[in-house]
Design a protein with these regions (language model features):
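Fe(II)/2-oxoglutarate oxygenase catalytic core
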Residues: 112, 117-400, 406-441
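Conserved alpha-helical positions within TPR/SEL1-like repeat arrays
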Residues: 2-10, 33-44, 67-78, 101-108
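Residue-level detector of the short coil/turn that links helix A to helix B
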Residues: 12, 46, 80, 114-115
Length: 441
Protein backbone atom coordinates (compact mmCIF):
# COMPACT_ATOMS: atom_id res chain seq x y z
CA UNK A 1 0.00 0.00 0.00
CA UNK A 2 2.86 2.39 0.85
CA UNK A 3 4.66 1.63 -2.44
CA UNK A 4 1.45 2.13 -4.42
CA UNK A 5 0.96 5.45 -2.64
CA UNK A 6 4.42 6.58 -3.75
CA UNK A 7 3.61 5.76 -7.38
CA UNK A 8 0.20 7.45 -7.23
CA UNK A 9 1.74 10.59 -5.72
CA UNK A 10 4.30 10.71 -8.55
CA UNK A 11 1.39 10.47 -11.00
CA UNK A 12 -0.29 13.43 -9.30
CA UNK A 13 -3.11 11.41 -7.74
CA UNK A 14 -2.61 12.91 -4.30
CA UNK A 15 -5.91 11.87 -2.69
CA UNK A 16 -5.51 8.25 -3.80
CA UNK A 17 -1.92 8.27 -2.53
CA UNK A 18 -3.14 9.55 0.83
CA UNK A 19 -5.64 6.70 1.06
CA UNK A 20 -2.87 4.17 0.35
CA UNK A 21 -0.64 5.54 3.11
CA UNK A 22 -3.56 5.55 5.54
CA UNK A 23 -4.35 1.93 4.62
CA UNK A 24 -0.72 0.94 5.20
CA UNK A 25 -0.80 2.58 8.64
CA UNK A 26 -4.08 0.88 9.52
CA UNK A 27 -2.39 -2.47 8.84
CA UNK A 28 0.82 -1.51 10.66
CA UNK A 29 0.43 1.52 12.98
CA UNK A 30 4.22 1.68 13.42
CA UNK A 31 5.00 1.81 9.69
CA UNK A 32 7.57 4.60 9.77
CA UNK A 33 7.82 5.38 6.05
CA UNK A 34 4.05 5.39 5.59
CA UNK A 35 3.66 8.00 8.37
CA UNK A 36 6.41 10.09 6.77
CA UNK A 37 4.92 9.84 3.27
CA UNK A 38 1.48 10.69 4.62
CA UNK A 39 2.92 13.80 6.26
CA UNK A 40 4.51 14.90 2.99
CA UNK A 41 1.19 14.36 1.20
CA UNK A 42 -0.72 16.40 3.79
CA UNK A 43 1.81 19.20 3.35
CA UNK A 44 1.26 19.22 -0.41
CA UNK A 45 -2.46 19.45 0.24
CA UNK A 46 -1.92 22.41 2.57
CA UNK A 47 -3.08 20.49 5.65
CA UNK A 48 -0.15 21.55 7.78
CA UNK A 49 -1.44 20.50 11.20
CA UNK A 50 -2.07 16.98 9.96
CA UNK A 51 1.39 16.94 8.38
CA UNK A 52 2.86 18.11 11.69
CA UNK A 53 1.17 15.23 13.53
CA UNK A 54 2.57 12.72 11.03
CA UNK A 55 6.14 13.96 11.37
CA UNK A 56 5.87 13.99 15.15
CA UNK A 57 4.70 10.37 15.01
CA UNK A 58 7.73 9.43 12.89
CA UNK A 59 10.06 11.07 15.43
CA UNK A 60 8.28 9.27 18.25
CA UNK A 61 8.91 5.96 16.44
CA UNK A 62 12.50 6.87 15.49
CA UNK A 63 14.08 9.93 17.18
CA UNK A 64 17.09 9.68 14.84
CA UNK A 65 15.11 10.13 11.61
CA UNK A 66 16.84 13.28 10.35
CA UNK A 67 14.46 13.89 7.43
CA UNK A 68 11.47 13.88 9.78
CA UNK A 69 13.05 16.56 12.00
CA UNK A 70 13.79 18.61 8.88
CA UNK A 71 10.25 18.21 7.49
CA UNK A 72 8.74 19.07 10.87
CA UNK A 73 10.88 22.22 10.83
CA UNK A 74 9.42 23.19 7.45
CA UNK A 75 5.87 22.84 8.79
CA UNK A 76 6.65 24.74 11.98
CA UNK A 77 8.17 27.58 9.98
CA UNK A 78 5.03 27.77 7.83
CA UNK A 79 2.98 27.88 11.03
CA UNK A 80 5.10 30.80 12.28
CA UNK A 81 6.90 28.85 15.00
CA UNK A 82 10.35 30.00 13.93
CA UNK A 83 12.37 29.12 17.04
CA UNK A 84 10.91 25.61 17.14
CA UNK A 85 11.68 25.26 13.43
CA UNK A 86 15.30 26.23 14.10
CA UNK A 87 15.53 23.55 16.78
CA UNK A 88 14.23 20.95 14.33
CA UNK A 89 16.76 21.91 11.66
CA UNK A 90 19.57 21.88 14.20
CA UNK A 91 18.51 18.41 15.37
CA UNK A 92 18.40 17.13 11.80
CA UNK A 93 21.90 18.51 11.15
CA UNK A 94 23.16 17.03 14.42
CA UNK A 95 21.92 13.59 13.31
CA UNK A 96 23.11 13.99 9.70
CA UNK A 97 25.63 16.83 9.16
CA UNK A 98 25.46 16.26 5.40
CA UNK A 99 21.68 16.66 5.10
CA UNK A 100 21.62 19.37 2.44
CA UNK A 101 17.92 20.25 2.79
CA UNK A 102 18.14 20.77 6.56
CA UNK A 103 21.19 23.01 6.17
CA UNK A 104 19.53 25.08 3.44
CA UNK A 105 16.30 25.40 5.44
CA UNK A 106 18.28 26.52 8.49
CA UNK A 107 20.10 29.13 6.40
CA UNK A 108 16.84 30.38 4.94
CA UNK A 109 15.48 31.32 8.37
CA UNK A 110 18.37 33.75 8.91
CA UNK A 111 18.08 35.02 5.34
CA UNK A 112 14.38 35.82 5.67
CA UNK A 113 14.94 37.67 8.96
CA UNK A 114 17.45 40.11 7.36
CA UNK A 115 18.91 40.98 10.77
CA UNK A 116 22.18 39.05 10.86
CA UNK A 117 24.00 39.14 7.52
CA UNK A 118 27.07 37.34 8.84
CA UNK A 119 25.16 34.31 10.14
CA UNK A 120 22.89 34.15 7.08
CA UNK A 121 25.88 34.12 4.73
CA UNK A 122 27.80 31.65 6.91
CA UNK A 123 24.89 29.17 7.06
CA UNK A 124 24.28 29.49 3.33
CA UNK A 125 27.94 28.84 2.53
CA UNK A 126 27.93 25.82 4.85
CA UNK A 127 25.15 24.38 2.69
CA UNK A 128 27.18 24.96 -0.48
CA UNK A 129 30.12 23.17 1.13
CA UNK A 130 27.89 20.15 1.75
CA UNK A 131 27.03 20.12 -1.95
CA UNK A 132 30.65 20.31 -3.06
CA UNK A 133 31.84 17.81 -0.47
CA UNK A 134 29.33 15.22 -1.68
CA UNK A 135 29.50 16.04 -5.39
CA UNK A 136 29.49 12.96 -7.58
CA UNK A 137 28.67 12.11 -11.17
CA UNK A 138 25.30 10.50 -11.85
CA UNK A 139 25.96 7.13 -13.51
CA UNK A 140 29.51 8.30 -14.24
CA UNK A 141 28.18 10.99 -16.57
CA UNK A 142 27.78 14.76 -16.80
CA UNK A 143 25.31 16.89 -18.76
CA UNK A 144 27.04 18.33 -21.81
CA UNK A 145 25.58 21.82 -21.24
CA UNK A 146 26.80 21.78 -17.60
CA UNK A 147 30.34 20.81 -18.62
CA UNK A 148 30.26 23.57 -21.27
CA UNK A 149 29.36 26.12 -18.60
CA UNK A 150 31.91 24.84 -16.11
CA UNK A 151 34.85 24.95 -18.51
CA UNK A 152 33.84 28.45 -19.64
CA UNK A 153 33.79 29.53 -16.00
CA UNK A 154 37.12 27.81 -15.28
CA UNK A 155 38.74 29.63 -18.21
CA UNK A 156 37.27 32.91 -16.95
CA UNK A 157 38.68 32.26 -13.46
CA UNK A 158 42.07 31.45 -14.96
CA UNK A 159 42.02 34.69 -16.95
CA UNK A 160 41.40 36.58 -13.68
CA UNK A 161 44.32 34.74 -11.99
CA UNK A 162 42.22 32.89 -9.44
CA UNK A 163 44.18 29.89 -8.14
CA UNK A 164 41.81 26.99 -7.52
CA UNK A 165 42.82 23.44 -6.75
CA UNK A 166 42.52 21.18 -9.79
CA UNK A 167 41.57 23.90 -12.28
CA UNK A 168 44.33 23.22 -14.84
CA UNK A 169 43.66 19.48 -14.95
CA UNK A 170 39.92 20.18 -15.18
CA UNK A 171 40.36 22.52 -18.16
CA UNK A 172 42.68 20.08 -19.95
CA UNK A 173 40.32 17.11 -19.52
CA UNK A 174 37.12 19.06 -20.22
CA UNK A 175 38.67 20.49 -23.40
CA UNK A 176 39.50 16.99 -24.59
CA UNK A 177 35.97 15.76 -23.87
CA UNK A 178 34.20 18.70 -25.56
CA UNK A 179 36.63 18.53 -28.48
CA UNK A 180 35.43 15.09 -29.52
CA UNK A 181 33.56 15.20 -32.82
CA UNK A 182 30.36 13.68 -31.41
CA UNK A 183 30.22 16.30 -28.64
CA UNK A 184 30.90 19.18 -31.02
CA UNK A 185 27.95 18.02 -33.13
CA UNK A 186 25.68 17.68 -30.09
CA UNK A 187 26.71 20.88 -28.29
CA UNK A 188 23.12 22.23 -28.42
CA UNK A 189 21.52 18.95 -27.35
CA UNK A 190 20.46 19.91 -23.82
CA UNK A 191 19.48 16.35 -22.92
CA UNK A 192 22.81 14.76 -23.80
CA UNK A 193 24.92 13.31 -21.00
CA UNK A 194 28.57 12.40 -21.55
CA UNK A 195 29.75 9.06 -20.18
CA UNK A 196 33.07 9.47 -18.34
CA UNK A 197 35.81 6.94 -17.74
CA UNK A 198 37.57 6.63 -14.37
CA UNK A 199 40.59 8.72 -15.42
CA UNK A 200 38.32 11.56 -16.57
CA UNK A 201 36.34 11.43 -13.34
CA UNK A 202 39.54 11.62 -11.29
CA UNK A 203 40.72 14.60 -13.35
CA UNK A 204 37.46 16.55 -13.14
CA UNK A 205 36.41 15.92 -9.54
CA UNK A 206 39.02 17.91 -7.53
CA UNK A 207 37.97 21.19 -9.19
CA UNK A 208 34.24 20.41 -9.13
CA UNK A 209 34.39 19.63 -5.41
CA UNK A 210 36.21 22.88 -4.60
CA UNK A 211 34.36 25.85 -3.11
CA UNK A 212 35.03 29.28 -4.60
CA UNK A 213 32.90 32.36 -3.95
CA UNK A 214 33.57 35.97 -4.91
CA UNK A 215 33.78 38.34 -1.94
CA UNK A 216 31.84 41.45 -2.88
CA UNK A 217 33.17 44.89 -1.98
CA UNK A 218 31.48 46.84 0.78
CA UNK A 219 28.92 49.33 -0.52
CA UNK A 220 27.84 52.22 1.67
CA UNK A 221 24.21 53.24 1.41
CA UNK A 222 21.52 51.81 -0.81
CA UNK A 223 22.21 49.15 -3.44
CA UNK A 224 19.18 50.12 -5.52
CA UNK A 225 19.26 53.32 -7.58
CA UNK A 226 19.28 56.25 -5.14
CA UNK A 227 18.30 58.72 -7.87
CA UNK A 228 14.82 57.21 -8.24
CA UNK A 229 11.77 58.34 -6.33
CA UNK A 230 10.81 54.89 -5.09
CA UNK A 231 7.56 56.04 -3.50
CA UNK A 232 6.40 57.14 -6.95
CA UNK A 233 7.39 53.73 -8.31
CA UNK A 234 5.41 52.10 -5.52
CA UNK A 235 2.32 54.22 -6.19
CA UNK A 236 2.51 53.50 -9.91
CA UNK A 237 2.52 49.76 -9.20
CA UNK A 238 -0.28 49.91 -6.63
CA UNK A 239 -2.43 51.97 -9.00
CA UNK A 240 -1.70 49.84 -12.06
CA UNK A 241 -4.52 47.87 -13.62
CA UNK A 242 -2.75 44.53 -13.62
CA UNK A 243 0.11 44.61 -11.06
CA UNK A 244 2.89 44.30 -13.62
CA UNK A 245 5.56 46.93 -14.24
CA UNK A 246 9.20 47.20 -15.17
CA UNK A 247 11.84 49.45 -13.61
CA UNK A 248 14.88 50.53 -15.62
CA UNK A 249 18.24 51.41 -14.00
CA UNK A 250 17.21 49.33 -11.00
CA UNK A 251 20.52 48.83 -9.18
CA UNK A 252 23.23 51.35 -8.38
CA UNK A 253 26.23 51.12 -10.73
CA UNK A 254 28.48 49.78 -7.98
CA UNK A 255 26.03 47.11 -6.80
CA UNK A 256 25.39 46.02 -10.38
CA UNK A 257 29.11 45.65 -11.10
CA UNK A 258 29.68 43.61 -7.93
CA UNK A 259 26.68 41.34 -8.46
CA UNK A 260 27.77 40.64 -12.01
CA UNK A 261 31.29 39.71 -10.91
CA UNK A 262 29.87 37.54 -8.13
CA UNK A 263 27.76 35.66 -10.69
CA UNK A 264 30.66 35.16 -13.09
CA UNK A 265 33.28 34.13 -10.51
CA UNK A 266 31.36 32.14 -7.88
CA UNK A 267 31.08 28.35 -8.22
CA UNK A 268 27.47 28.30 -7.08
CA UNK A 269 25.66 27.19 -10.26
CA UNK A 270 24.85 23.60 -9.40
CA UNK A 271 21.15 23.03 -10.14
CA UNK A 272 20.56 21.71 -13.67
CA UNK A 273 17.33 22.36 -15.58
CA UNK A 274 16.10 20.68 -18.75
CA UNK A 275 16.17 23.81 -20.90
CA UNK A 276 19.94 24.23 -20.56
CA UNK A 277 20.08 26.68 -17.69
CA UNK A 278 21.61 26.51 -14.23
CA UNK A 279 20.27 27.69 -10.89
CA UNK A 280 21.96 29.09 -7.77
CA UNK A 281 20.08 29.78 -4.54
CA UNK A 282 20.27 32.11 -1.57
CA UNK A 283 20.26 29.25 0.95
CA UNK A 284 23.20 27.49 -0.72
CA UNK A 285 25.94 29.98 -1.58
CA UNK A 286 24.23 32.49 -3.88
CA UNK A 287 24.46 35.20 -1.28
CA UNK A 288 26.46 38.27 -0.29
CA UNK A 289 25.90 41.44 1.77
CA UNK A 290 24.75 43.12 -1.45
CA UNK A 291 22.10 40.47 -2.15
CA UNK A 292 20.71 40.93 1.36
CA UNK A 293 20.95 44.72 1.29
CA UNK A 294 18.83 44.80 -1.88
CA UNK A 295 16.03 43.10 0.06
CA UNK A 296 16.31 45.61 2.90
CA UNK A 297 16.35 48.52 0.43
CA UNK A 298 13.16 47.26 -1.18
CA UNK A 299 11.41 46.94 2.19
CA UNK A 300 12.54 50.44 3.25
CA UNK A 301 12.01 52.33 0.00
CA UNK A 302 8.76 50.61 -1.05
CA UNK A 303 7.25 50.07 2.41
CA UNK A 304 3.65 49.48 1.35
CA UNK A 305 4.65 46.79 -1.13
CA UNK A 306 7.47 44.94 0.58
CA UNK A 307 7.33 46.16 4.18
CA UNK A 308 4.60 43.76 5.40
CA UNK A 309 6.16 40.71 3.75
CA UNK A 310 9.16 38.61 4.71
CA UNK A 311 11.82 37.82 2.15
CA UNK A 312 11.10 34.27 0.99
CA UNK A 313 14.25 33.48 -0.91
CA UNK A 314 16.19 34.72 -3.89
CA UNK A 315 18.08 32.96 -6.65
CA UNK A 316 19.87 33.37 -9.93
CA UNK A 317 19.51 31.58 -13.25
CA UNK A 318 22.28 31.45 -15.81
CA UNK A 319 21.38 30.36 -19.33
CA UNK A 320 23.21 28.78 -22.20
CA UNK A 321 23.62 31.59 -24.71
CA UNK A 322 22.32 29.47 -27.59
CA UNK A 323 19.12 28.57 -25.76
CA UNK A 324 15.96 28.89 -27.80
CA UNK A 325 13.42 28.63 -24.99
CA UNK A 326 13.80 29.65 -21.37
CA UNK A 327 11.97 28.73 -18.19
CA UNK A 328 8.65 27.01 -18.75
CA UNK A 329 5.39 28.71 -17.76
CA UNK A 330 4.87 28.64 -13.99
CA UNK A 331 3.80 30.71 -10.98
CA UNK A 332 5.37 31.15 -7.54
CA UNK A 333 4.02 30.65 -4.02
CA UNK A 334 4.66 34.25 -2.98
CA UNK A 335 3.04 37.70 -2.92
CA UNK A 336 5.51 39.80 -4.91
CA UNK A 337 8.04 38.68 -7.51
CA UNK A 338 10.96 40.92 -8.48
CA UNK A 339 13.10 39.75 -11.38
CA UNK A 340 16.11 41.70 -12.69
CA UNK A 341 18.72 41.15 -15.40
CA UNK A 342 22.47 41.75 -15.15
CA UNK A 343 24.00 40.77 -18.51
CA UNK A 344 24.95 43.85 -20.63
CA UNK A 345 22.76 44.57 -23.67
CA UNK A 346 25.73 44.23 -26.04
CA UNK A 347 25.49 40.44 -25.64
CA UNK A 348 21.80 40.24 -26.59
CA UNK A 349 21.40 39.48 -30.31
CA UNK A 350 17.66 40.26 -30.31
CA UNK A 351 16.77 43.49 -28.53
CA UNK A 352 13.03 42.75 -28.75
CA UNK A 353 13.27 39.42 -26.99
CA UNK A 354 15.11 37.61 -24.19
CA UNK A 355 12.90 39.05 -21.46
CA UNK A 356 9.84 37.85 -19.59
CA UNK A 357 6.26 37.02 -20.59
CA UNK A 358 3.74 37.57 -17.78
CA UNK A 359 0.07 36.53 -17.94
CA UNK A 360 -2.26 38.79 -15.97
CA UNK A 361 -4.56 36.15 -14.45
CA UNK A 362 -3.54 34.70 -11.04
CA UNK A 363 -3.32 30.98 -10.43
CA UNK A 364 -6.25 29.44 -8.53
CA UNK A 365 -5.79 29.30 -4.76
CA UNK A 366 -6.46 25.57 -4.63
CA UNK A 367 -3.75 24.54 -7.09
CA UNK A 368 -0.78 22.55 -5.75
CA UNK A 369 2.91 23.16 -6.45
CA UNK A 370 2.80 20.68 -9.34
CA UNK A 371 -0.15 22.54 -10.89
CA UNK A 372 1.80 25.79 -10.57
CA UNK A 373 5.05 24.49 -12.02
CA UNK A 374 4.81 21.28 -14.03
CA UNK A 375 1.59 20.91 -16.00
CA UNK A 376 2.15 23.37 -18.85
CA UNK A 377 -0.84 22.21 -20.91
CA UNK A 378 -3.16 22.65 -17.94
CA UNK A 379 -1.76 26.15 -17.32
CA UNK A 380 -2.17 27.29 -20.94
CA UNK A 381 -5.72 25.88 -20.98
CA UNK A 382 -6.52 27.81 -17.79
CA UNK A 383 -5.05 31.02 -19.23
CA UNK A 384 -7.05 30.68 -22.45
CA UNK A 385 -10.30 29.97 -20.60
CA UNK A 386 -9.76 33.06 -18.44
CA UNK A 387 -8.83 35.38 -21.34
CA UNK A 388 -5.41 36.15 -19.89
CA UNK A 389 -3.38 38.90 -21.54
CA UNK A 390 0.31 38.27 -22.15
CA UNK A 391 2.54 41.22 -21.22
CA UNK A 392 5.90 40.77 -22.93
CA UNK A 393 8.72 42.70 -21.25
CA UNK A 394 11.83 42.76 -23.51
CA UNK A 395 15.26 42.15 -22.00
CA UNK A 396 17.31 45.14 -20.90
CA UNK A 397 20.45 45.37 -18.79
CA UNK A 398 19.65 46.44 -15.21
CA UNK A 399 15.90 46.25 -15.81
CA UNK A 400 13.68 44.84 -13.06
CA UNK A 401 10.22 43.39 -13.57
CA UNK A 402 7.84 43.58 -10.61
CA UNK A 403 4.62 41.58 -10.62
CA UNK A 404 2.11 39.58 -8.64
CA UNK A 405 3.77 36.22 -7.91
CA UNK A 406 0.51 34.38 -8.54
CA UNK A 407 0.68 35.40 -12.21
CA UNK A 408 1.96 32.73 -14.56
CA UNK A 409 5.13 33.74 -16.34
CA UNK A 410 7.83 32.33 -18.60
CA UNK A 411 11.10 33.37 -20.16
CA UNK A 412 10.90 34.67 -23.70
CA UNK A 413 13.11 33.17 -26.41
CA UNK A 414 16.80 33.76 -25.78
CA UNK A 415 19.52 34.53 -28.32
CA UNK A 416 22.66 35.90 -26.68
CA UNK A 417 26.27 35.84 -27.85
CA UNK A 418 27.87 32.42 -27.43
CA UNK A 419 30.52 33.31 -24.85
CA UNK A 420 30.77 33.00 -21.08
CA UNK A 421 30.26 36.69 -20.27
CA UNK A 422 27.35 36.73 -22.72
CA UNK A 423 25.23 34.24 -20.80
CA UNK A 424 21.91 35.73 -19.75
CA UNK A 425 21.75 36.02 -15.94
CA UNK A 426 18.66 36.96 -13.99
CA UNK A 427 18.07 37.39 -10.27
CA UNK A 428 14.68 36.70 -8.68
CA UNK A 429 13.44 37.79 -5.24
CA UNK A 430 10.23 36.48 -3.68
CA UNK A 431 8.47 38.31 -0.85
CA UNK A 432 5.64 36.92 1.24
CA UNK A 433 4.08 33.50 0.91
CA UNK A 434 0.91 32.52 -0.89
CA UNK A 435 -0.19 29.31 0.82
CA UNK A 436 -2.58 26.72 -0.48
CA UNK A 437 -5.88 27.23 1.33
CA UNK A 438 -6.65 24.74 4.08
CA UNK A 439 -9.63 24.46 6.38
CA UNK A 440 -7.24 23.62 9.20
CA UNK A 441 -5.29 26.87 9.28
Amino acid sequence: HNSLGIILKELGEIEKAKECYEKAISINPNYLNAHYNLGTTFRELGERLKAKNCYEKVIELNPDYADAHNSLGVILKELGEIEKAKECYQKAIEIDPDLFSASSNFANIYISQLTDFETAICKSNETLKIYHKNYKFINQSIALFKLKHDIEQANYLNSKNYKINGIDEFIKTADEILGREENKEDINNYSKRILLNNDEINSLLPYLKKNHTYQTKTISGSCINQKKNWLDVEDEYLNSANQIMYIDDFLSDEALKELREFSLVSKVWYKEYNNKYLGAFSDSGFISPIHLQIAIDLKQKLPKLFGPHKLGRFWGFKYDSMLGKGINVHADFAIHNLNFWITPDEYNNNKNSGGLKVYDVPAPDNWTFKNYNINGNKIYKFLKENNANCINVPYKFNRAVLFNSAYFHETDEIDFKNEYEGRRINNTYLFGRRLVKSSLD
